Amino acid sequence: MKDENSINFLSSNENYLYDKSENELRPKVFEDFKGQANVKETLSIFIRASKERDEALDHVFLSGPPGLGKTTLASIIAFEMNASIKITSAPAFDKPKDIIGILTGLDEKSVLFIDEIHRLRPIIEEMLCIAMEDYELDWVIGQGANARTVRMPLPKFTLIGATTKPGKVTSPLYARFGITARFELYSEIELVEIIKRNSIILNIEIEEDAAFLLARSSRGTPRIANRLLRRIRDIAQVTGSLVVTSDIVAIGLEMLRIDGEGLDEQDRNILRSLILKFNGGPVGVDTLAISVGETADSLEDFYEPYLIMKGFISRTHRGRKATEFAYLHLNLEMKEDNLNENQRVSF
């Protein structure tokens, strides 16, 4: 069951979850999966225990910012459990028959991965909750006085649900997951390990300091590190460089308008808008998002985690505020009242 055929996409619209360009770089076993040490350690224990009892792994809930490896880890879990996996996302379930067809097609101990699980429709979620707990499905046939309920048994399967918005997952659904894990942004050291591993796969020779420079610009996210590594490979190829040096990386980052802190042009637009349009804040996320042409979801899911981690933005009960570090990074002068306010917040 560990061959490529064990990975099944349920909708062509969901292939972004596992596109071919990323597939070659995805680790297949825990040993090759860098970072998220606590998540790997606990999951390894639970997987081993389940295999020793010859049982399906309990349902797993994965949360965290996008691009950190939730889909990859789901595939590794299936591999370690010697199980097949079906990959999809919540928006693919439009009608009850969609989830019924998928659940009844599962094998014993197989894995169903649902990304963006917070976006499930209520009727689909209700059916899924019953399936997760009782391994049965209630299906209503007919209408009105002739309606009757048919109960269908399901194989013991493992549902892996992933989301970037755990707060939007309802309590009844969340309670069905026996294992929960949160992904955190990766450290530079962890990203360097990922870059070195993937440079070998891509047949790239990269110097140590170049790998660190690339890691520093990857926003703590392996998906971004992989994307940048490919672009740097293009530059090295065109310039005739056999080895990726820090100079090559610097040229590439400048072309992509990524600065030394890993901020791209939109990151800087967010900080400039916060400082110049809203006097450093506080300002609500919806207002800030509109000012830079983003949705509140994209601002919260993609941009904010890194800006907060790097200390450029702080969250308060009144809204987002630019920190002193943000002013310094953009070479903007901080007004005295804002400076005093930031000092009060820091203490």
Curated annotation (Swiss-Prot):
**A GO BP entry:** DNA recombination
Flavoprotein: is it a keyword of this entry? no
Annotated residues that bind DNA are located at R315, R320
Task: From the Swiss-Prot or TrEMBL record, state where the protein is found.
Answer: Cytoplasm
Q: Name one Pfam family in it.
A: RuvB_C
Alphabetically ordered keywords of this record = ATP-binding, Cytoplasm, DNA damage, DNA recombination, DNA repair, DNA-binding, Hydrolase, Nucleotide-binding
Annotated region Head domain (RuvB-H): where? 260-347
One of the entry's Gene Ontology molecular-function terms is:
ATP binding
Q: Would you name any one GO CC term?
A: cytoplasm
Q: Where does ATP bind?
A: L25, R26, G67, K70, T71, T72, E133, D134, Y135, R176, Y186, R223
User: Per its UniProt record, what InterPro entries does this chain match?
Assistant: AAA+_ATPase, AAA_lid_4, DNA_helicase_Holl-junc_RuvB, P-loop_NTPase, RuvB-like_N, RuvB_C, WH-like_DNA-bd_sf, WH_DNA-bd_sf
Would the keyword rRNA-binding be found if you checked this record's keyword annotation?
no
Under the heading CDD domains, the entry gives:
AAA
Domain of life, per UniProt, equals: Bacteria
Residues given in the record as Mg(2+) binding sites: T71
Q: What is its EC number?
A: 3.6.4.-
User: Which NCBIfam families does the UniProt record give?
Assistant: PRK00080.1, ruvB
Q: What is known of its domains?
A: Has 3 domains, the large (RuvB-L) and small ATPase (RuvB-S) domains and the C-terminal head (RuvB-H) domain. The head domain binds DNA, while the ATPase domains jointly bind ATP, ADP or are empty depending on the state of the subunit in the translocation cycle. During a single DNA translocation step the structure of each domain remains the same, but their relative positions change.
State the PANTHER family in the record: HOLLIDAY JUNCTION BRANCH MIGRATION COMPLEX SUBUNIT RUVB, PTHR42848
Matches recorded under HAMAP family: DNA_HJ_migration_RuvB (MF_00016)
- Record-stated family: Belongs to the RuvB family.
Its subunit composition reads: Homohexamer. Forms an RuvA(8)-RuvB(12)-Holliday junction (HJ) complex. HJ DNA is sandwiched between 2 RuvA tetramers; dsDNA enters through RuvA and exits via RuvB. An RuvB hexamer assembles on each DNA strand where it exits the tetramer. Each RuvB hexamer is contacted by two RuvA subunits (via domain III) on 2 adjacent RuvB subunits; this complex drives branch migration. In the full resolvosome a probable DNA-RuvA(4)-RuvB(12)-RuvC(2) complex forms which resolves the HJ.
Protein's UniProt name: Holliday junction branch migration complex subunit RuvB
Name the source organism. Borreliella afzelii (strain PKo)
Q: What is the organism lineage in this UniProt record?
A: Bacteria, Pseudomonadati, Spirochaetota, Spirochaetia, Spirochaetales
